[in-house]
């Protein structure tokens, strides 16, 4: 272990993914304590800078999810405070969180993405913005918050788009729906992990399927052809590098094998702050590669830095 023994675990926050972050942060804090680190847990509020200055950590373990914690804001604050932190830096975090900007990078790198269009929420709420089926997503959210499938024959958009309670931004992305299977893969530094197939017990892999007990099954390694498996790994690492990610990231895919002789692999997004509960996807993949949960989070602390 390096001299960076006092770790501030940043969790909670005030995004739509607060509850997920609290669970991730708790798991990381417990594992780091077991590995000999002195840990202070910080439920991140708008006084986060004051909290960090008071605690004076050697490293910040960023277990925040969603806006402000995952989009470059907290990363920029930690750069200003000169506190080394885990995961990706300001630019990579901001790019990955904004689905449209991330696609610009992926296309430039020659990576496979689906056709999409970004429109005002009001426009999506009053008629089809592309031929169905398609998926409507907030431009800058994670954990499938605010994601809906619009299918052929649907006469009206999801009611949530016109709700006064909608707080997920004024623009949404409409993206061609990809039939088939849900795959995910992760990177740790320069090491590429295996591939997981996710089978949701709901219509699609939405927030409930991700976080409710029994909401989905994870098959590791994914039962797919070796060439597709290798391609998922290649694209995962290429996307990680194209965005300029550091530390750990996870790439999510759709694999359409429903048309004989015409398989299609599509990169959906890169998650720079993937879930870090002991049973989350990245810790499961790390375990497949021979790393315990504690070894994974310890590695992340030892790799923490500024100037990312």
Curated annotation (Swiss-Prot):
GO terms for cellular component: cytoplasm. Pathway: Cell wall biogenesis; peptidoglycan biosynthesis. ATP binds at residues 130-184. Pfam families: Dala_Dala_lig_C (PF07478), Dala_Dala_lig_N (PF01820). Binds 2 magnesium or manganese ions per subunit. Keywords: ATP-binding, Cell shape, Cell wall biogenesis/degradation, Cytoplasm, Ligase, Magnesium, Manganese, Metal-binding, Nucleotide-binding, Peptidoglycan synthesis. Its EC number is 6.3.2.4. InterPro entries: ATP-grasp, ATP_grasp_subdomain_1, D-Ala_lig_Van_CS, D_ala_D_ala, Dala_Dala_lig_C, Dala_Dala_lig_N, PreATP-grasp_dom_sf. It comes from the Bacteria. Mg(2+) 1 binds at residues 252, 269. Mg(2+) 2 binds at residues 269, 271. One of its GO terms (molecular function) is D-alanine-D-alanine ligase activity. Belongs to the D-alanine--D-alanine ligase family. Cell wall formation. This is D-alanine--D-alanine ligase. The lineage of its organism: Bacteria, Pseudomonadati, Pseudomonadota, Alphaproteobacteria, Hyphomicrobiales. The gene is ddl.
């Amino acid at each position: 272990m390096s001299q960076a023994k006092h770790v501030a675990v940043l969790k909670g926050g005030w995004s739509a993914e607060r509850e997920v972050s609290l669970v991730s942060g708790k798991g990381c804090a417990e594992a780091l304590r077991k590995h000999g680190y002195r840990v202070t847990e910080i439920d991140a509020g708008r006084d986060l800078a004051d909290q960090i200055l008071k605690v004076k950590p050697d490293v910040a373990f960023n277990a925040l999810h969603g806006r402000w914690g995952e989009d470059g804001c907290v990363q920029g604050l930690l750069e200003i405070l000169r506190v080394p932190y885990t995961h990706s830096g300001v630019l990579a975090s901001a790019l990955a969180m904004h689905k449209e900007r991330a696609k610009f990078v992926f296309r430039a790198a020659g990576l496979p993405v689906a056709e999409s269009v970004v429109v005002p929420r009001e426009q999506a709420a009053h008629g089809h913005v592309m031929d169905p089926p398609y998926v409507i997503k907030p431009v800058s959210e994670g954990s499938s918050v605010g994601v809906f499938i619009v299918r052929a024959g649907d006469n009206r958009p999801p009611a949530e788009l016109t709700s006064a309670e909608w707080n997920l931004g004024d623009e949404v992305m409409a993206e061609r729906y990809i039939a088939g299977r849900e795959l995910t893969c992760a990177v740790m530094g320069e090491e590429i992990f295996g591939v997981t197939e996710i089978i949701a017990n709901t219509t699609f892999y939405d927030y409930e399927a991700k976080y409710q007990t029994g909401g989905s099954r994870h098959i590791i390694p994914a039962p797919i052809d070796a060439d597709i498996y290798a391609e998922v790994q290649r694209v995962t690492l290429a996307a990680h590098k194209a965005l300029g990610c550091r530390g750990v990231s996870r790439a999510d895919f759709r694999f359409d094998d429903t048309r004989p002789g015409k398989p299609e692999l599509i990169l959906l997004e890169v998650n720079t702050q993937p879930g870090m509960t002991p049973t989350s996807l990245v810790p499961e993949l790390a375990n497949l590669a021979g790393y315990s949960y504690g070894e994974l989070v310890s590695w992340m602390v030892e790799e923490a830095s500024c100037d990312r």
